[in-house]
Design a protein with these regions (language model features):
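Nucleic acid-machinery interaction/catalytic patches
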Residues: 1-341
Length: 341
C-alpha cells in the first residue's frame, strides 16, 4: 500500500515539477519531514526543494507577530486586569488560577473568529437572568460576580492591544492576524503556489484562510480521509469533511482531492496479545521490534494507551533503533525529578 504522503507527493511532482515557488503546508512538522523524504525518493532530478511548513509556522508567517509564551501572556493579562474598573484586585498568585482559563477562552475566541464583546455581553445577560430575584438589591458577592463578566470585553481589548504593541500574540491572536493579512500576503508572493496536505478538521480561521487561497486559484488542498468514512453520515471521522463539502463554495465546482479508498480495499492483519502488567507489555513491544526489518521499523508506529507506559517502552526498545517520540509525560516520572523533590 502506498502511504498517503507518498501518493500526494508523487501527484504533485507530475502536475508541477517546478517546486521553486511552492509552499507545502502540513498539520505538523513531522508530516513535512516524511513528505521531504518521499520527494527525494520519487524525484531523480536535481531540483530546488519546496518550502515545508507546519500549519503553526505558516500562520506565524502570515501573522507577522511572534508567538508569546504562556508565562508572558499571563503577565500581560494580569497587567491588563489591573487597569480595569474592578475595585478589589486580586494578587498575581490568586489571579493565575482563573487567569489561565481566561487566556484559553481568549485564544478560542480569536481562533474561531468570535466577537468578544458580543459573546461576553450575551453571557453577562444570561448571568443576570440566572441571578434574578424578587429582592431589588443583590448581595455584594453577586454584584462582584456580575461585574466580573461586565469587564471581560474591556480586559480582552486591553490585553490584545498590549500584545500587539510588543509584536507578540497567543495562538488565537496569531490566527486572527493571519486571517487579516492573507490578502496582502498573496499580493506580496504573486508567483507562489500553496499546497495544503493531510488536513481534516479545521478551526474557523484555518478554514477561511485556506478557502481564500483556493478562491484566488493559488493552491490546492489534499484531504487525509477515506471514502468509507466520508460516505457514512453517522461516522465521526468524516464529520468535518462532510461539513466542508456542504459549506465551502470551492466544492461547488471542485471535487475533494486526496480522498482514498484504502479502508475497504486493503487487507488488514490484526494480532492480539494477552499480556499482564505494564512492564510485560513494554517487553513484548521490544521483542516484536527485534523481529522487524529496518524497513518495517521505519514504517511502524507505537501508540500507547497510557502515558505511564512511556518509560518502560523506551527502555525496552532494542539498542541501535532510533525512535522519534512525540508524547507528553509528567516531570514526576523523570528520574532527575528525585533531585528536586
Amino acid at each position: 500500500m502506498t502511504p498517503f504522503l507518498a501518493e500526494i507527493t508523487d501527484k504533485i511532482i507530475k502536475e508541477n515539477p517546478d517546486f521553486s515557488n511552492t509552499i507545502w503546508v502540513f498539520p505538523s512538522k513531522r508530516a513535512g519531514v516524511f513528505a521531504a523524504n518521499y520527494l527525494k525518493k520519487n524525484n531523480s532530478k536535481t531540483i530546488f526543494a519546496p518550502e515545508f511548513l507546519s500549519i503553526e509556522a505558516f500562520i506565524t508567517r502570515l501573522a507577522v507577530i511572534e508567538p508569546a509564551s504562556t508565562e508572558t501572556s499571563l503577565c500581560l493579562l494580569y497587567e491588563s486586569y489591573l487597569e480595569t474598573g474592578i475595585k478589589d484586585k486580586e494578587s498575581f498568585s490568586s489571579f493565575i488560577g482563573w487567569g489561565t482559563t481566561i487566556l484559553q477562552d481568549f485564544n478560542e475566541i480569536d481562533r474561531y473568529g468570535v466577537t468578544a464583546k458580543k459573546l461576553y455581553t450575551h453571557i453577562q445577560n444570561l448571568q443576570e437572568v440566572s441571578h434574578w430575584a424578587l429582592e431589588e438589591d443583590k448581595t455584594e458577592m453577586v454584584k462582584a460576580y456580575l461585574k466580573f463578566w461586565e469587564i471581560l470585553p474591556e480586559l480582552y481589548e486591553r490585553f490584545t492591544k498590549k500584545m500587539l504593541a510588543q509584536g507578540i500574540g497567543h495562538q488565537g491572536l496569531l490566527y486572527k492576524k493571519a486571517k487579516e493579512n492573507i490578502a496582502q500576503f498573496l499580493i506580496d508572493l504573486p508567483a507562489t503556489t500553496f499546497y495544503f496536505i493531510g488536513f481534516n478538521a479545521l478551526n474557523t480561521s484555518e478554514s477561511d484562510i485556506i478557502q481564500y487561497i483556493l478562491s484566488e486559484k493559488r493552491g490546492s488542498i489534499f484531504w487525509d480521509l477515506d471514502q468509507y468514512f466520508l460516505e457514512n453520515p453517522l461516522h465521526e471521522a468524516g464529520y468535518f469533511m462532510r461539513k466542508h463539502l456542504k459549506n465551502w463554495p470551492y466544492f461547488q465546482e471542485s471535487k475533494p482531492e486526496g480522498v482514498s479508498n484504502r479502508y475497504t480495499s486493503t487487507e488488514k492483519k490484526v494480532n492480539i496479545y494477552g499480556v499482564p502488567k505494564s512492564v510485560s507489555q513494554a517487553q513484548l513491544i521490544g521483542e516484536i521490534l527485534n523481529e522487524f526489518s529496518q524497513e518495517q521499523v521505519l514504517n511502524t508506529a507505537i501508540v500507547l494507551g497510557d502515558e505511564e507506559l512511556l518509560n518502560p517502552v523506551i527502555h525496552a526498545i532494542p539498542n541501535g533503533l532510533k525512535a522519534n517520540i512525540t508524547m507528553g509525560a509528567p516531570l514526576s516520572g523523570v528520574p532527575m525529578a528525585a533531585l528536586v523533590a
